[in-house]
Each structure stands twice: as structure tokens, then as C-alpha cells.
Amino acid sequence: MKNIRNFSIIAHIDHGKSTLSDRLIQTCGGLSDREMEAQVLDSMDLERERGITIKAQSVTLNYKAKNGETYQLNFIDTPGHVDFSYEVSRSLAACEGALLVVDAGQGVEAQTLANCYTAIEMNLEVVPILNKIDLPAADPERVAEEIEDIVGIDAMEAVRCSAKTGVGIEDVLEEIVAKIPAPKGDPNAPLQALIIDSWFDNYLGVVSLVRVKNGVLRKGDKIKVMSTGQTYNVDRLGIFTPKQVDKNELECGEVGWVVCAIKDILGAPVGDTLTSQHNPASSVLPGFKKVKPQVYAGLFPVSSDDYEAFRDALGKLSLNDASLFYEPETSTALGFGFRCGFLGLLHMEIIQERLEREYDLDLITTAPTVVYEVELTNGDVIYVDSPSKLPPLNNISEIREPIAECNMLVPQEYLGNVITLCVEKRGVQTNMVYHGNQIALTYEIPMGEVVLDFFDRLKSTSRGYASLDYSFKRFQAADMVRVDIMINGERVDALALIVHKDNAPYRGRELVEKMKELIPRQQFDIAIQAAIGNHIIARSTVKQLRKNVLAKCYGGDVSRKKKLLQKQKEGKKRMKQLGNVEVPQEAFLAILHVGKDSK
């Protein structure tokens, strides 16, 4: 056990985590050169296309160190994007150490900081590593100072390497063996194993990734899931070298996968503890805090026949992604669907894309909203995650919106642009610290403004150099109103949105104009209105198409023409009473893009 090392790799987006993992696997001979491909651990097609890591993956490698001993390295590659920080905290719960990878050209960024603090809070040994030293822009000395200054860990001795060219990879491995402590645990104690991740395999059922903290997990054991008390038989277990390799037992301190023929998706929740049935452990391992979704949106299948398939797909996906929340919802415009909770917009996009690809569904998404705390006139407090659930205005005493604390690292030359953006998003500055050329800014910005398009706008105003990390701070009273969109006098529930009163006329007008372009013309006028309660704040009309009924009248009497026009008018009137308007899919997506192009 003294030769086991469990560690994660944490870093900002694009600082080279996945490439470093590739090199470690290659150096330790986990895969032959023929099987090696770039980003070997990013197994989803989506991860490869976007070039980001979404799911944490684990690998077990054997490394023969310079002192002649062979060490077993279990490492977990983690995502860097702010929406997936829960994946990082799950991976860290299974480790004793973490490699903090920093790009020697870019330096420290917000995510580097956030993930590093998570690791330090969990009492892990953090080993700094400067990557990409082969770049002409690399300045390892400056970056090492930056790490000491901003993060506050000793980085003068940090290993300098280049994952792309393979320089310094041996030093990284030696550093892991020297600096990261061996796992603590008692092989003779009752079994305790932490479930780090689970996913659904069509042949094996539920596969769980576990870290054995105490005791030994053997094939054929009867095990018990501590939170549900259900017992299962261990059918197969083993490790990833990235390939799935079967073993007969997982020893204390090891990380591996387990299959116990669990058919039920909720059978082995992530963060739970496995123990043996005959000699159960007395206490549960401390898991990790459940993450609260920050953004809610309605997802509806385009054809209602897909509802069952959609429900199954969500179940399977939520097993693999513990932070996805969903509950059934009905909408008068869109039929049956689900209200889903996500960690951010990227998370929402990825879930939607995974549902469409992996499960072959066609979905409509409604506009994302955040959760509001609403105090009613009778003193009750309710939480509203969808505009259609907001009670009538005269029953509400106040609405409180969620405020996010945003930590940004910005180069000096873009400071002005970023501050302007934050003010426009109703932000309040709480702190500002200079670190050399970088400035650490702290703002409190309403969550509703952050989740919509703040990240994209921040990147574009700073040419991609500013970085962001945000977390929920508190609820704060604000003047929020619900804007309803009415088409021909009928409210379309899926298009409603909750906005700040000052922005309402402007958002309403923009949305109405956008809808006008998207709704196809009919034989009669279509009125599109935005309203707060009964007060109309914006209107626009999609003009009717009309046939020239006088074409056949060459000369003729004026009364004849009047008669024909009158007849047409009556027909249109009758049509307008009976006609209903089809709202195309693009119109629902229009809400997302309001305010983006106009600025």
C-alpha cells in the first residue's frame, strides 16, 4: 500500500491537462503506440469535438521509479470548465494529492485558483507543474512567482515540462512519487469504498468507479449500499489502464470499477459508501456536498410519442451526471416535458446535445431561468424556478433574486471594458487586488445576468484573456417582474420571462421584434405583444398576406369592387377568430439571444 499514489490533475481550461494525461499513460506503457491517440481519456465524441473534458476519467498505471521500486499510480483527469467544478470536487475526494498544471505562457487564471482552493480545503498535497515550456511565449520564472503571489504555494521548485513534446515527463512522475503521500487506511478493517462516479452500460447495467478507503473488495463478495441498505453481489471488478482490465480484488487505497448487476438507475448513488454485508462498517464515508442547480430550463420532445424514451434517457444520463435535476412539467404550448436544472449554460448545452446524439431525440428548450425566492403576502416563502409558476403580482410582497459572487482575473489593459460590462449587468464591486499585470476583481452580480451570456461577453471584451469563477452568495430583494408574450391575445407560457423592472420594456421590445421575424406570415394579421400583468409594454404586427380580389374586375362598377373587398374582409375576420398560429422552434430559442447581437 505504501507504493500507491492517488492524484488528480487540476487546471484552467486549455492548460494541457488531457495532453499531460496522455504523456503519463504513454510513458508508463498503459497503451501501445498503436492504440495511443490524442486525448485518450476524453471518451465522448462531444468532448473531442469541443476539445474540452466533461467527465472525470480514471486510469491506473505502473511506474518503475529511479529508486528501483514500482509504484501504482491511480490518476483522475478532471474538467477545467467552471460549469463542471463539481466533477473536480468528486475526483479530489478520492485522492491524496493533486497536480496543479499551469500554462507557462498564460499564467494563473481564475479556475486554477478555484480548483486549487478546493484541493487545499480537502487537505490534499498540491504539486505545481509548469506546462508548455516549449512555447516561445513561455516565461516559467514569472509564472512561478505568480503562483506564489496569487495562489500562495511554493513554486520555485515546480517541475517544468512540456506535455506536447514529452520534455520533463519523467520529472513529473518522480515528483508525484516523492511529494504525494501514500493512502492511509486499514486493509483488515470492515470494507468502506466511496463511489466516485457511475454510468450505465447496456450490457453490464450500472458500472461504478470506486475508491477503496478501508478493507478489501473481492469478486463474489456480498456488498451493501449504505444509504439505501440494498445488497448486491460483486460480479466483476477491475481497473482502467485506460482499457477495462478484470481483477479478482481491489485492495485498500486502490481506485477501480465494480459491476454488481444493479439494474435500477438509483441503486448506487454517487458519493455513497459501499460496505460488506457480513461485516458492515459503522459509519459512512464523508462524501461531497450535493450541488444545487443554478439554471433551470424546460425540455420538451418535439413529438409527444418520444416522451417515454426521453424519460428513460434522462434517467440514464442523471446517473452519470449527478448534478442534473429533473421533474415532469406540462406546458399548454409544448405539451409534456421536463423541467431540468443545470449548473450553467455550457452544462445545459452539453446535456441537450448528449440527449440528441446518444439517445436520438429531438428537443425544444425554453429560456433558462434561475431560482427566485418569493415572499407571499401571507408570509409564506416559496422558490420559483419557472416564470409560469410565479404567483399573481397582488399576492407577492417581495421577490428576491440570487446574487452570485464572481471572481475574475483580468489583465490591466482590459480592466475598463470588464468593469463597464459588470456595471451593465447590475454588478456591485466588492474587491480589487493588483498582482503584477493581473488584477483580481470581485463583483456581486445577479445570477440571472451571469448565467445568460456573461461568460461569452467577458471573453469577447477582453479578447479571451479574462477568466471567471462564480458561486452562489445569497438572495437579495429586487424589483423583478414577469413579462408575458401574447400572440393574438393568447399568452404563450413557454415564452414568459422574469426580468428586472428597469430592463423589462427594452427586453420586451427586443423579443417582440425578434418574434416578428420568426413567425411566418398568415392570411390574417398576427399581433405579438409583451405585457407585464395587464399593461402592454411592446407590440408588433406580422402583416397578413392578401390576394388581389379585384384582379378580374378590369373596368366595372365601383360598387362591384366594394362588394368583393367587403367579402374578403369578412372572410379574414372569420379566419382570425378560428385560425391558430404555429410558433416555430426558433422562436423559443430567440429568448436566449435577446441582447446579444444588439450591443
Curated annotation (Swiss-Prot):
UniProt cross-references to Pfam families, sorted A to Z: EFG_C (PF00679), GTP_EFTU (PF00009), GTP_EFTU_D2 (PF03144), LepA_C (PF06421)
UniProt main location, coarse: membrane
Gene3D superfamilies listed in its UniProt record: 3.30.70.240, Elongation factor 4, C-terminal domain (3.30.70.2570), Elongation Factor G (Translational Gtpase), domain 3 (3.30.70.870), P-loop containing nucleotide triphosphate hydrolases (3.40.50.300), Translation factors (2.40.30.10)
GO biological process, one term: positive regulation of translation
Enzyme class: hydrolase
Matching InterPro entries: EF-4, EFG_III/V, EFG_V-like, EFTu-like_2, G_TR_CS, LepA_C_sf, LepA_CTD, LepA_IV
Protein location: Cell inner membrane
Superkingdom, taxonomy of origin: Bacteria
Segments forming a coiled coil: none
Catalysed reaction equations from the record: GTP + H2O = GDP + phosphate + H(+)
Gene Ontology cellular component list: plasma membrane
Lipid bilayer topology: Peripheral membrane protein
Protein task: Required for accurate and efficient protein synthesis under certain stress conditions. May act as a fidelity factor of the translation reaction, by catalyzing a one-codon backward translocation of tRNAs on improperly translocated ribosomes. Back-translocation proceeds from a post-translocation (POST) complex to a pre-translocation (PRE) complex, thus giving elongation factor G a second chance to translocate the tRNAs correctly. Binds to ribosomes in a GTP-dependent manner.
NCBIfam families: lepA (TIGR01393), small_GTP (TIGR00231)
Protein name: Elongation factor 4
Lineage: Bacteria, Pseudomonadati, Pseudomonadota, Gammaproteobacteria, Pasteurellales
